[in-house]
């Protein structure tokens, strides 16, 4: 992931705004080090997001086999970020580079 990030940042050197998206927490060695500073209200599109995520059947099966429901986790995370953003559901991002 570090190499991908570095490559992306190099490729985006002339792009004015770069944001990192939050991944769904999967308890392996998960340390919550993600500190968002930008939120997008997704209240109107949460159902579409959840339904689209259900297309990732292999990931759903993989984590279901160890007792995790990643669709449920995604909804919970979106609700949590919604509380932070003062709306019902939100996505969180970390601003890496922004031209104001």
Predicted features and spans:
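Metal-dependent de-N-acetylase/amidase catalytic core
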Residues: 1-100
């Amino acid at each position: 992931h570090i190499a991908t990030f570095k490559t992306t940042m190099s490729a985006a050197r002339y792009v004015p705004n770069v944001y990192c998206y939050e991944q769904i927490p999967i308890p392996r060695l998960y340390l919550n080090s993600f500190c968002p500073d930008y939120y997008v209200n997704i209240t109107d599109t949460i159902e579409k997001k959840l339904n689209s995520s259900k297309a990732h059947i292999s990931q759903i099966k993989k984590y279901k086999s160890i007792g995790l429901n990643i669709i449920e986790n995604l909804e919970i995370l979106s609700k949590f970020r919604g509380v932070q953003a003062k709306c019902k559901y939100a996505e969180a991002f970390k601003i890496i580079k922004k031209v104001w």
